[in-house]
């Protein structure tokens, strides 16, 4: 028995075709939106590629771009089919291909749903990518004279200013690396020598941070050196006083930014997916309603449209059986090819 059967007369078929035509062209616009979102995300990821590990994935933006293009193509074609469905002579050329086209639409909807899920799940992979990338970027902060790394200081400073953050997980990350170039160290100074000797790796470590970590909203002039030395500053206690630095780490700031982007894009993609599913269902009803017209010359006759020709369980069984038959036919062809090669070998 057909699933969700609906009766159609000529007036209802025309209204369905016209409604689907309009929905398809709206979906073309939605496809352009998805394409634009994917392009925007790709550009934003490229902007921060210097503070991301080399393994950062552009799968999600590339998928959004691809699905946006496919949405425009498929819905333009579906709009043409719906327009021609009003004319029996024009619809005849689409009739042999419509069932296959519906299968392609179902596959497209499945992939679109998976892409929407990927938008929500990208945060995990992005977190590890940012953690390693920011760590490397901070390590190369001092290499202003090294070709290929001379831009890293400017990149990190602009990042910390724009996102109001400091370090990877926090400002103390700067205490663990030498971020001042040897070029600007006075090696004749006893303080510099003592600091380098006190470190196992021979690095010049200080309890200070770059200027870009300073919070301009603080009423006190920025304290960026000797942050843990209370006696170095008047009326200062680093354990109890709120420092005039950005407290949040840049990894958390970037994750928050990209996370909000991905959630918004995932929500938009899900809405487009729901719209595409409704179009596919409408196309299925239009297809079965037109197929059910008993007398093509009598356009006023009633017909029945349905979503599935059989129940869900029966349709699933038929699908599994078709897969088994396909597998057996491939196996027979392979055995026939092996048998044909055996006499030649003899």
Curated annotation (Swiss-Prot):
Broad class of the protein's primary localization: membrane
Annotated InterPro entries: Peripherin/rom-1, Peripherin/rom-1_CS, Peripherin_LEL, Tetraspanin/Peripherin, Tetraspanin_EC2_sf
Lumenal topological intervals: 44-61, 124-264
Glycan attachment points: 53, 229
GO molecular function: protein homodimerization activity
CDD domains membership: peripherin_like_LEL
SUPFAM superfamilies for this protein: Tetraspanin
Lipid bilayer topology: Multi-pass membrane protein
UniProt GO BP: cell adhesion; detection of light stimulus involved in visual perception; photoreceptor cell outer segment organization; protein heterooligomerization; protein homooligomerization; protein localization to plasma membrane; protein maturation; retina development in camera-type eye
Residue span of region Interaction with MREG: 341-346
Location in the cell: Membrane; Cell projection, Cilium, Photoreceptor outer segment; Photoreceptor inner segment
Keyword Transmembrane: yes
Protein family per UniProt: Belongs to the PRPH2/ROM1 family.
Subunit structure as annotated in this protein's UniProt entry: Homodimer; disulfide-linked. Forms a homotetramer. Forms a heterotetramer with ROM1. Homotetramer and heterotetramer core complexes go on to form higher order complexes by formation of intermolecular disulfide bonds. Interacts with MREG. Interacts with STX3. Interacts with SNAP25.
Protein name: Peripherin-2
